Amino acid sequence: MSTQSPNHHEDITKTSSVNMTTTTTTTKTKAAAKAGTNAAPKQKTQMHRRSRTGCYTCRLRRKKCDEGSPMCTACKHLGLCCEYKRPMWWSNNDARRKQKDEIKMIIKRKKLSEKSSHTIQTSINTPPGLSHSLPTSATFSDPLDRNRSASIDSHFGFNFNSPQHGQDFAAFATPQIHVNGEYMFPPFSPYEIDMKTERQIFINDIPTLRESTVSTFSTYQTPPPPGTILPSFPLEGEWTEQVFSERRESLTEETFNANFFDFACDPAMASSQVAIELDDGDQKLLDHFVQHVLPTIFPILESNQHGSISSELVLPSLANNKGYLHCCLSIAAQHFKSTMGIQNEEIDNDIMRHRYATITWLCEALNRDENHQPILDATLGLIFFQCIVGRPEDTLPDIPWHQHFQAVVSLVQKLDLAGLVSDITKPLAHTPFNMTLTSWIDILGATMLGSSPLFAHTYRNKHLSINNHSLGLRELMGCEDRVMYLISEIACLESLKNQGMDDITLCQHVRGLGDEISNTEVNEGTLVEPYNANGTLSPKQLSKNITAAFRLAARIYLCSLVPGFYPAQPSCMGLVEKLTAVLQLIPSGVNGYDRSLTWVYLIGGSVSVPGSSFRDFFENRVAQLGDVANSGSFGRMTVLLREVWLQYEAILAAAEAAAGTSSLSSETPQQQQQVNAHYVRWREVMQIKGWDYLLI
């Protein structure tokens, strides 16, 4: 591979600082009464986590929703209808505008009613800081919905806002409650504050990635006068059953353990200044990488965490790992070229310059044979990032992914990562992230080559382990670890078949692996859309749906090894229809997870026959992705599937022409057998076309 030296033109270098900051600005304060002149200084406000999953009423009003159950604080305070399920008016602009006008009228009438009926003189003091605000109906809201980083193993520490002890429950059983307003509530006027929260990544003090939201905080209405008798509170009935049901569902929701992985770097560095020396051209590439590539790297991991795991993982390495930096800049140039549709020599030079610099750095580092962790990071980046960017028509020279993976295997062995995760006597507190990523590439990459995974023995031991079976694959890419281990076993069986295993032994192994796949379905229950009752994404249910899709794809892959297999078999067609039904439960579109199921679409689509519902469903999902569907592994898989279908239909057309009819119904058994024996296999198409893809 030859290209110009990175120093072929004069570099104008400068220090690039990558910084992630969060700022909060109070934009508006509303009070029911004028504050006193001798007001105390406001105390520091408590930040709220950003939420994209509030009720549709708050979304329409563009207000912060605390996701209270059964009603959020804002809707309860204003007497509005709180809807967590998508309402009919949401999908129509006119209906949405009408609904917004109705909400305004309701709020206006409520304010006028409060003003006319407000005859009680209340104390006029300066409102305290938010840290002294009273609990609202958010007492019943789910803290897990707002903080997905709660530990998966933690049984304690959940914030229920107003914890009660056993001796306190008697207060709720009294039929009447005598309230002293001065005792229960501090004597201040109710108020509302809108807070604008911004989260930015700065490079050279220039904002690149920016997230902004406006949140509203409201206190209770004015407390009743002393001596007021409140009506008894019904503790039984439909409302309390609904609250209990929703809380039980949210509390049993399994959340991602943020400390599950060992990222081999300090995540705290992601929030501090990261100094990088770059010239002006490379600075633009880095900006593009941070803005457009970084958020798409690990969508399943991000959905579990509701945070910025990719930033915590990647940004520190950019400053400390020169090979990794060149790799990311090359990927950024490749992504910029494909998304912007640019075809010129300058962008190609940027791609090849940084690609060459990465390979040069890796060769020098491997020759030194020291400090293996940064080398492993950069090598895995060369492999995995290609699954996110680029297009099938890319013609620039590159090293095949499986040659890079040979270096990965050597580095994993030197770091003894496979031994660390397999040692049952000393279980690790944190799974090495690079071992999890390596396993993902190893297992599905083996199916690309028709060979055994290089760490198949490790996966076999993990599968048989009772207490130490997880490698973190479910957390990283969505599929349960044991199902991935079985895909590894199927790849091993295919390798043995290619080496000449007899048909009887092959069928025995196929039956045994089929039973093992069935064992992973025990207690799975019915699959549903991955959303909670309040409309938030359920990571646990999403994982179940993704696992079910991989499980069906694994069955199809296993059945394809049976001698005499062909796609038009009723059993195969039935599996493809089941797979289509499961894929309908995966969120679609640019913000969905279809691109995380590239391998599943490949296996299922490659055996779908003309007229199958899978093909129409697949084309619909591609259309929903838009131009994004043409990039990365998903784009390459789409081109491969369409080529497989084209060649398969050509075989059918040739068979019809030979039979002298437009239908296969009158074909002789010999002609039908000939068509079945020559159905197009996706790996053969890749070999014919010279495609060396890693489709994960």
UniProtKB/Swiss-Prot annotation:
Keyword tags: DNA-binding, Metal-binding, Nucleus, Transcription, Transcription regulation, Zinc
Q: Which Pfam families does the record associate with it?
A: Fungal_trans_2, Zn_clus
Q: Where is this region: Disordered?
A: 1-48, 112-145
Composition skew (Low complexity), residue ranges: 21-40
Query: What spans are recorded as compositionally biased (Polar residues)?
Result: 118-140
Q: Which residues bind DNA?
A: 55-82
Xref: SUPFAM superfamilies: Zn2/Cys6 DNA-binding domain
Enumerate the Gene3D superfamilies for this protein. Zn(2)-C6 fungal-type DNA-binding domain (4.10.240.10)
One annotated Gene Ontology cellular component of this protein: nucleus
Q: Which GO terms fall under molecular function for this chain's record? A: DNA binding; DNA-binding transcription factor activity, RNA polymerase II-specific; zinc ion binding
Main localization is nucleus
The cellular location(s) given in this protein's UniProt record come to: Nucleus
Q: Which domain of life is it from?
A: Eukaryota
Listed name of the protein: Transcriptional regulatory protein pro1
Q: Organism, per UniProt? A: Neurospora crassa (strain ATCC 24698 / 74-OR23-1A / CBS 708.71 / DSM 1257 / FGSC 987)
| Name of the gene | adv-1
